[in-house]
Amino acid sequence: MNKAFLIRVLAILLTVSLFSSGGCSSGEVAYDKLRERMVRDQIGARGVSDRLVIDAMMKVPRHLFVPPDLRGLAYIDNPLPIGEGQTISQPYIVALMTQSLGLKGGERVFEVGTGSGYQAAVLAEIVDTVFTVEIIPELAERAQALLDTLGYGNVQVRAGDGYEGWPEKAPFDGVIVTAAAPRIPDPLLDQLKVGGRIVIPIEDGYQELQVHEKTAEGLELLFTLPVRFVPMKGKVRDSRTR
């Protein structure tokens, strides 16, 4: 049996257990309780303390951003497949990356790699506007439809290559990249305000999450962490090293 099949079997078993237990009067209440536990045990207990981030993670219904047959696994701390060879990041990493942007509220943030739209939704609970680009058109369309349905009118999704950024909407207070790149794309730095941060997984034999702050002199590295992301596609693969 392959891994994908086992994941789906586990999801079905957990879903049956979840909705047959006597402690929850409805499916949404059950998901609310699982989300509370996720935030407490997987996020808060591991050092994510920014109140804006905690509140955002409590509000966004992660189970709606995964395939229906995987909703029983939505609140465990693991990435999950969302189709097209892509994944939704584990909740802790989403919270950590969001906290690493140093958001205060009211910002304009650019995201590379919309995927399911979950990271964009978390950001949208905090900032003024999220601009997000997805290289796979089917995912971009699906994410925009879901975000619209959930009332996230402050998220704009575009299908395209995130390497180029979104110059018409720049400059940005923060940039977040949800796929591993061999280097930081120049256009993303050009479109980032001085004082803003970029959070990006970099692959160079292995992957590490890097958090940089843009200064008048260049970039200041603030933080690194070993991670594992799907690779960033498109022009970044043949771009020159900065």
Q: How would you name each of these model-derived features?
A:
Residues 1-10:
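Bacterial N-terminal signal peptides that target proteins for export
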Residues 18, 23-69, 203:
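N-terminal auxiliary segments of SAM/dcSAM-dependent transferases
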Residues 203-242:
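Active-site capping/gating segments
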Residues 40, 77, 88-107:
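Conserved alpha-helix/loop element of class I SAM-dependent methyltransferases that forms part
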Residues 102-219:
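Conserved nucleotide-cofactor-binding alpha/beta core module
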Residues 65-82, 87:
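Short, surface-exposed glycine/acidic/tryptophan-bearing loops
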Residues 41-46, 56, 60-63, 100, ...:
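Structured segments of extracytoplasmic/periplasmic soluble domains
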Residues 9-21:
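Bacterial N-terminal signal peptides
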